[in-house]
Amino acid sequence: ANKKQGFVFDNEKWVHPIDVKPFEISNTPVTFSQYLAFVEDDGYQNKELWEDEGLEWLERSGQRHPIFWQKDENGQWQWRWFQEWLLLSPFLPMINVNWYEAKAYCKWADRRLPAEAEWEYAASMSENELNEEKGIYPWGNSHPESAQANLNSLTGGIEDVRAYATGDSRFGLRQMIGNVWEWTEDIFNPYPGY
């Protein structure tokens, strides 16, 4: 947060410089179909994909797939949306996985979770040029419109990762705000000096 913003959480004060080295990031959130490939490749059984704490969680929980997934009587995967079971839609963003599951998926996919600073850099660069000035939103500083992001559950659910192209960041990254929450590598801690 910067001092020009009206409301900020006290543990988000204040913007401070961080060195961000070059990195790569996916242009959309991970989808159900991408995560399903991990599940069907025995990602929950392959202990080499899990860090020690994640493996402890996995063994305690007994999970072999995401908690809100199940196979129907025809062997098709379903996901739970409140009280309803729906067939997996390939382009919906992956939801309801914990940090350990996200990290295991990333290792399987030969990726990693972005650091918070990397994610913020990718999501909030200036709308005019790449410099130290952060934009408020991925597309710049103009207030969000309904065509740019699924905010405040206005659609009543999650949306296809291909939706909201007008909300893309300068880097062509889609849905950097709204729709679902994202995991980063960092543990949630207040900024230095808080």
Where are these regions (language model features)?
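A recurrent short beta-strand within the Rossmann-like NAD(P)-dependent oxidoreductase core
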Residues: 22
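Acidic-aromatic/histidine active-site loop/patch
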Residues: 31
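Functional-site microenvironments in short loops/helix caps that host divalent-cation chemistry
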Residues: 1-13, 18, 28, 43-194
